[in-house]
A protein has these predicted regions:
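A generic structural signal for short beta-strands and their flanking turns/coil linkers
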Residues: 15-17, 22, 30, 41, ...
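A broad, structure-centric signal for solvent-exposed, well-ordered loop/edge residues
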Residues: 20, 28, 33, 41, ...
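Catalytic strand-loop segment that frames the active site of acyl-thioester-processing enzymes
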Residues: 2-60, 151
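HotDog/MaoC-like acyl-thioester-processing domains
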Residues: 1-14, 98-157
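Hydrophobic beta-strand-centered segment that forms part of the acyl-chain substrate-binding groove
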Residues: 57-60, 67-112
Length: 157
């Protein structure tokens, strides 16, 4: 059983720093279920149709990869004790390679710099670059995000 870490608020997060998430293996069932519910393209639903697609095989929706990244990010920040609230904005998002069935992905999180949230005294913003990588260490998706983290102390807006 892992020890619960003390809460880390925005003021206490060290930047720059690098975090690595756990891995998530993406099954054919995961891909098809997400595809049926949210992105019903043939290459997300049918293995045979996917073979003749531009991707050449059953692959996850880019939005599915985003959802996986969000879970990996949230779990990692929470496990570190960081009081993560969510994302303020995502100014950059790029899909690079497909995530195929049975690929194992993880997130490499670079916490770059901190700034006060001018619109809310309860939060601070941490700029982050996140790369989702597969088991071959290839980037499958990269993004820049502004993470909202609970602030310990109120500050002047």
């Amino acid at each position: 059983m892992s020890k619960i870490k003390r809460p880390i608020c925005w003021e206490d997060v060290t930047t720059p720093s690098r975090l690595i998430s756990d891995r998530k293996t993406v099954s054919a069932s995961d891909i098809k279920q997400f595809g049926m519910n949210f992105d019903p393209q043939p290459y997300h639903l049918d293995r045979d149709a996917a073979k003749t697609s531009i991707f050449g095989g059953l692959c996850a929706s880019g939005w599915h990869v985003c959802a996986i990244m969000m879970r990996l990010l949230s779990d990692k920040l929470t496990s570190e004790g960081i009081q993560f609230i969510g994302n303020d904005e995502i100014p950059k998002l790029k899909w690079i390679e497909p995530v195929f069935e049975d690929d194992s992905v993880y997130a490499e999180i670079q916490l770059k710099e901190k700034q006060r949230d001018p619109s809310n005294v309860d939060f601070g913003i941490i700029s982050a670059d996140i790369a989702v990588k597969n088991q071959r260490e290839s980037d499958v998706m990269v993004l820049s995000a502004e993470l909202l983290v609970k602030a310990r102390q109120h500050h002047d807006a």
